[in-house]
């Protein structure tokens, strides 16, 4: 029986062995009485050689007409050849065409196409080598996170997506009809994770989050994957240590397992190798001083947007923290700084090279009255948060947590020019199809 192999398994060590390959045509070139048919699958690309005197006139003519992305099965003998990808090729003896494609809508080099064309044909674009590489890196980052979290004693939980209230501001909620009332798509699992810490202490989840923001920047999506952690008995400094250790492990493990894919996007891996903790830490006050010294028009109390964060990242060659933000620009659930009531115990992790915030975290307010007052100050209805307030009535403890935007991390690791390429089917204010 002929052994079916993947493209990545075709190596010089298989010299003389008969194999079967199933995949899609990546490129097709006729040279005299031979056709060089490059076939790809999920693992790589293999050069196959179809000779007219071996397969016959009919099969040769059929092979000559195969366009990119035609699906085929070939059988043949492995031959070592240092000019071929992987150092070996397959001399074809049998070709089965599953479906012939005459013209594929995406150019052979997708970078020659407009972003809009690639997004219109996203269902086809994701099969191209670089798009596939992005998804492999993304899955590996998540796998690495799971490894680290399991080893460090964190429990994975599965919070709801349909919710009754806002976590990050009511203006960015997607509202939908829920039988005889209204519900919203979750902006964050945080509040539910906070409930889970009283039984499990250290919890995490990976869920989609939704933000109805009409932001048209290179780092915003309306739907994204959110890796969130919450822990009892931790203060802000404790949770920052967790963040840097987790991100460091995710990046280093992915470098170990997906170096080939990362090198499709990065010539220099120095910045990624520079993720050993501890990461630098600067206060919000120091950040304002740095920005003002560079001529940026920003005042104490202003939020740090993409432009300000980009300038700050020029000061660092690795991820870093900005901590101690003004209360007025942060969420209601963040704990007030006991040493300065103008501030909250919050920290953002920013990625270098202009990528900015990838994690937002804080110590949570654990006092019932203070949390209730913050909800009222924000103009929200305490009834929507009755259950959340209950957590401060029955054995409340100091606790902290954070959320990591998975696509933002992927975008930085691969130096992508836009976060949308880190999403399988990106959702933006202008894009809901396909």
Curated annotation (Swiss-Prot):
InterPro entries given in the database record: Aa-tRNA-synt_II, aa-tRNA-synth_II, aa-tRNA-synth_II/BPL/LPL, Asn-tRNA-ligase, Asp/Asn-tRNA-synth_IIb, NA-bd_OB-fold, NA-bd_OB_tRNA
Catalytic reaction(s) noted: tRNA(Asn) + L-asparagine + ATP = L-asparaginyl-tRNA(Asn) + AMP + diphosphate + H(+)
UniProt keyword DNA-binding present: no
EC number: 6.1.1.22
Predominant localisation class: cytoplasm
Name this protein carries in UniProt: Asparagine--tRNA ligase
Family, similarity comment: Belongs to the class-II aminoacyl-tRNA synthetase family.
Subcellular location field: Cytoplasm
Ranges in a coiled coil: none
Pfam families reported for this sequence: tRNA-synt_2, tRNA_anti-codon
MF GO annotations: asparagine-tRNA ligase activity; ATP binding; nucleic acid binding
Keywords attached to this entry: Aminoacyl-tRNA synthetase, ATP-binding, Cytoplasm, Ligase, Nucleotide-binding, Protein biosynthesis
GO CC aspect terms: cytoplasm
BP GO terms, sorted: asparaginyl-tRNA aminoacylation
């Amino acid at each position: 029986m002929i052994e079916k192999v993947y493209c990545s398994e075709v190596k010089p060590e298989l010299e003389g062995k008969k194999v079967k390959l199933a995949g899609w045509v990546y490129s097709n070139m006729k040279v005299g009485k031979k056709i060089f048919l490059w076939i790809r699958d999920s693992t790589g690309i293999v050069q196959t050689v179809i000779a007219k005197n071996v397969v016959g006139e009919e099969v040769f003519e059929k092979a000559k007409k195969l366009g990119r992305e035609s699906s085929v099965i070939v059988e043949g003998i492995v031959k070592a050849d240092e000019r071929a990808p992987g150092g070996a090729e397959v001399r074809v003896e049998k070709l089965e065409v599953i479906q012939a494609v005459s013209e594929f809508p995406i150019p052979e080099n997708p970078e020659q196409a407009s972003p809009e064309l690639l997004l219109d044909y996203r269902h086809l674009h994701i099969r191209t080598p670089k798009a596939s590489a992005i998804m492999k890196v993304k899955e590996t980052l998540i796998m690495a996170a799971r490894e680290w979290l399991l080893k460090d004693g964190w429990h994975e939980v599965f919070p709801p997506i349909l919710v009754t209230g806002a976590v990050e501001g009511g203006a960015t909620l997607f509202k939908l009809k829920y039988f005889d009332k209204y519900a919203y798509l979750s902006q964050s699992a945080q509040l539910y994770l906070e409930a889970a810490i009283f039984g499990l202490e250290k919890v995490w989840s990976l869920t989609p989050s939704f933000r109805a923001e009409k932001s048209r920047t290179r780092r915003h999506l309306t739907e994204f994957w959110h890796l969130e952690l919450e822990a009892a008995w931790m203060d802000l400094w404790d949770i920052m240590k967790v963040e840097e250790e987790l991100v460091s492990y995710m990046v280093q493990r992915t470098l170990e397992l997906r170096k080939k894919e990362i090198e499709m996007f990065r010539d220099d891996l120095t910045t990624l190798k520079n993720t050993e903790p501890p990461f630098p830490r600067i206060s919000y006050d120091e950040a304002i001083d740095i920005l003002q010294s560079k001529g940026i028009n920003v005042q104490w109390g202003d939020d740090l947007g993409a432009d300000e964060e980009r300038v700050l990242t020029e000061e660092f060659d690795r991820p870093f923290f900005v901590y101690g933000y003004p209360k007025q620009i942060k969420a209601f659930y963040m704990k007030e700084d006991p040493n300065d009531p103008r501030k909250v115990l919050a920290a953002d992790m920013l990625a270098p090279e202009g990528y900015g915030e990838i994690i937002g975290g804080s110590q949570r307010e654990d006092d019932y009255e203070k949390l209730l007052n913050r909800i009222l100050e924000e103009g929200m209805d305490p009834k929507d948060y009755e259950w959340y307030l209950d957590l401060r009535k029955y054995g409340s403890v100091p606790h902290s947590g954070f959320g990591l935007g998975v696509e933002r991390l992927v975008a930085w690791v691969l130096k992508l020019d836009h976060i949308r390429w880190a999403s399988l089917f990106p959702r933006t204010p202008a894009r809901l199809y396909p």
